[in-house]
């Protein structure tokens, strides 16, 4: 059943919903050099340090993202399609060394051997082998897109940790285990060999003991369902990977033939929060994509006539809670944090009111210049932090129209409807100054100490450009204030918080970010900021071309 957006004028008095107004940007600089193929730098390069890196900051910042966008005459169409390039910034007693390597995935090796695109990616359909005859090329179109031999293992999105080992992942069945010292692939792991899922997100969550949780999906005789996955924290045998993984809950898709696309989920101490949003995957289009000569991305569409639903799962029992929470249509790619208070789950998200972002990230759009680039940017949805409240214990006797949230510190509301559902209106966690920064994405917190707990700060990238924006931002979610770092002509990556030894303060440490530029006469660098005042402590300059990447992690020595 498709639930259409209702109007609740009588409830809006207590929960003002301000509409963001954005200025039109003009004269955006071309960033095409940040989205072109680069050479790997497998031998360590000593960086030139300006300022200083704290002596206690010892370890490696690992990042990944696309770094090769063509093979022979074949070119990728979408930013997400590029071959995974692994980056390592190694810090030791104030010195910094950089290296990079292309992930030797089966996809990378197959494409390299044929010097063409052999395996399809998110936005690029691999063409039939020109060496085959006409009949063979025709029949090759009838291979199912999920067939293991034809599915990409180009895991270019994030580093994740299971049982103490690190894996590169995307959103398919496959992960690639890597040696974090050498950046070499050591093993390919298929989720479907352990549990009945067709993939998992690149953003798992972790309990303090190392137990990992993730979201996957599967399609069976009863339709499409979303799966909550749990992976134990420790190995029984040394050679294990994700052995012991379990599906602890299945959530039926609201619309069987068109489930939601999702990139992440929320977690508190006791609950998993899954957001079913109206960014839909048309299963028929995806299943027939190769026959129709279309890429996987052709099967994803924004359907704003549908609302966004919140599903809450008890981590201990695996039970889906009976509460039915929904809101106006929005899209979220990254959750900020979630916690419990006074019988409610509070979840903070980076939200967009338009779900066409995936279309914007076609490489032909990102590489534009002049008015064409301005038009693409001005038409793109901007992402802003919002808070939602989900009351867990809803009385059947609660009157229709009551706001069930008991929380005095947030204007987010949860209003009971006549049919027992709960309409959730958000609180904006920002003022107008964040609109001037183009919104925010790639949110990060002091995860080890504050994930699943009430918190004060998060860090992210401002988006006054299509790729990476031009700033790093510290957001105070209590006072709704910002601290901003910016340098003209440079584009910082996702900020990574590293705590100082012995600290329990949310901002008691430093922020690391890889900052790159399209200007050939300038060096890219690793930036270190004081997380409290957001002032620069130092930078480590590397005379190597780097593309803009996605996610990463810091691993202390």
Swiss-Prot record:
GO BP annotations, alphabetical order: carotene catabolic process; lutein catabolic process; lycopene catabolic process; retinal metabolic process; xanthophyll catabolic process; zeaxanthin catabolic process
Highest taxon listed in the record's lineage: Eukaryota
EC top class, as a word: oxidoreductase
Keywords (A to Z) from UniProt: Dioxygenase, Iron, Lipid metabolism, Metal-binding, Mitochondrion, Oxidoreductase
Cellular component GO terms held in the UniProt record: mitochondrion
Ligand binding (Fe cation): 203, 263, 334, 551
GO molecular function: 9,10 (9', 10')-carotenoid-cleaving dioxygenase activity; beta,beta-carotene-9',10'-cleaving oxygenase activity; beta-carotene 15,15'-dioxygenase activity; metal ion binding
Subcellular location: Mitochondrion
Its EC number(s): 1.13.11.-, 1.13.11.71
UniProt key word Transmembrane helix: no
InterPro entries: Carotenoid_Oase (IPR004294)
Residue stretches in coiled coil: none
Ribosomal protein as UniProt keyword: no
Pfam family, one: RPE65
Catalysis performed (reactions): all-trans-beta-carotene + O2 = beta-ionone + all-trans-10'-apo-beta-carotenal; 5-cis-lycopene + O2 = 5-cis-10'-apo-lycopenal + (3E,5E)-6,10-dimethylundeca-3,5,9-trien-2-one; 13-cis-lycopene + O2 = 13-cis-10'-apo-lycopenal + (3E,5E)-6,10-dimethylundeca-3,5,9-trien-2-one; lutein + O2 = (3R,6R)-hydroxy-alpha-ionone + (3R)-3-hydroxy-10'-apo-beta-carotenal
Cofactor: Fe(2+)
Function recorded in the entry: Broad specificity mitochondrial dioxygenase that mediates the asymmetric oxidative cleavage of carotenoids. Cleaves carotenes (pure hydrocarbon carotenoids) such as all-trans-beta-carotene and lycopene as well as xanthophylls (oxygenated carotenoids) such as zeaxanthin, lutein and beta-cryptoxanthin at both the 9,10 and the 9',10' carbon-carbon double bond. Through its function in carotenoids metabolism regulates oxidative stress and the production of important signaling molecules.
Identification of the protein by name: Carotenoid-cleaving dioxygenase, mitochondrial
Species per Swiss-Prot/TrEMBL record: Pongo abelii (Sumatran orangutan)
């Amino acid at each position: 059943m498709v639930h259409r957006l209702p109007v609740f004028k009588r409830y809006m008095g207590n929960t003002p919903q301000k509409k963001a107004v954005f200025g039109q940007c003009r004269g955006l600089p071309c960033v095409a050099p940040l989205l072109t193929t680069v050479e790997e730098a497998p031998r360590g390069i000593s960086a030139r340090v300006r300022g200083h890196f704290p002596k206690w900051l010892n370890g490696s910042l690992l990042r990944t993202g696309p770094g090769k966008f063509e093979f022979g005459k074949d070119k990728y169409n979408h930013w997400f399609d590029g071959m995974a390039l692994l980056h390592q910034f190694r810090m030791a007693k104030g010195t910094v060394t950089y290296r990079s390597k292309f992930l030797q995935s089966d996809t990378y090796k197959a494409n390299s051997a044929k010097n063409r695109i052999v395996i399809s990616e998110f936005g690029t359909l691999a063409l039939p082998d020109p060496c085959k005859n006409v009949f063979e090329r025709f029949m090759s179109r009838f291979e199912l897109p999920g067939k293991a031999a034809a599915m990409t293992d180009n895991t270019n999105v994030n580093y994740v940790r299971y049982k103490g080992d690190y894996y590169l992942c995307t959103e398919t069945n496959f992960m690639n285990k890597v040696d974090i010292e050498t950046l070499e692939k050591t093993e390919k792991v298929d989720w479907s060999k352990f549990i009945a899922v067709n993939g998992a997100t690149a953003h798992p969550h972790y309990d303090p003991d190392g137990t990992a949780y993730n979201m996957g999906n599967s399609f069976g005789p009863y339709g499409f369902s979303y799966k909550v996955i749990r992976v134990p924290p420790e190995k029984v045998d040394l050679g294990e990977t994700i052995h012991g993984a379990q599906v602890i809950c299945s959530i039926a898709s609201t619309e069987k033939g068109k489930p939601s696309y999702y990139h992440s989920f929320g977690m508190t101490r006791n609950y998993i929060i899954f957001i079913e949003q109206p960014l839909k995957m048309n299963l028929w289009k995806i299943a027939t994509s190769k026959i129709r000569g279309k890429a996987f991305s052709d099967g994803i569409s924004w359907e704003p006539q549908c609302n966004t639903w919140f599903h809450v799962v008890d981590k201990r029992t695996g039970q889906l809670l009976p509460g039915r929470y929904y809101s106006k249509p929005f899209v979220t790619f990254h959750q900020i944090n979630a916690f419990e208070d006074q019988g409610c789950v509070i979840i903070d998200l980076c939200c967009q009111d338009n779900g066409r972002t995936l279309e914007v990230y076609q490489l032909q759009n990102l590489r534009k210049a002049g008015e064409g680039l301005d038009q693409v940017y001005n038409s793109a949805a901007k992402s802003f932090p919002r808070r939602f409240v989900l009351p867990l214990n809803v009385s059947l006797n609660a009157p229709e129209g009551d706001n069930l949230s008991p929380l005095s510190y947030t204007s987010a509301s949860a209003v009971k409807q006549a049919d027992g559902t709960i309409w959730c209106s958000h609180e904006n966690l920002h003022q107008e100054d964040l609109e001037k920064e183009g919104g925010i994405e790639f949110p990060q917190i002091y995860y080890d100490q504050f994930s699943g707990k009430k918190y004060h700060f998060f860090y992210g990238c401002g988006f006054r450009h299509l790729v990476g924006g031009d700033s790093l931002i510290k957001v105070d979610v209590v006072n709704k204030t910002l601290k901003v770092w910016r340098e003209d002509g440079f584009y910082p990556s996702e900020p990574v918080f590293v705590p100082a030894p012995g600290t329990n303060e949310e901002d008691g440490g430093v922020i690391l970010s890889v900052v790159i530029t399209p200007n050939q006469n300038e060096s890219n660098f690793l930036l270190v900021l004081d997380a409290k005042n957001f002032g620069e402590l130092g930078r480590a300059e590397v005379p190597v071309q780097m593309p803009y990447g996605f996610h990463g992690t810091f691993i202390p020595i």
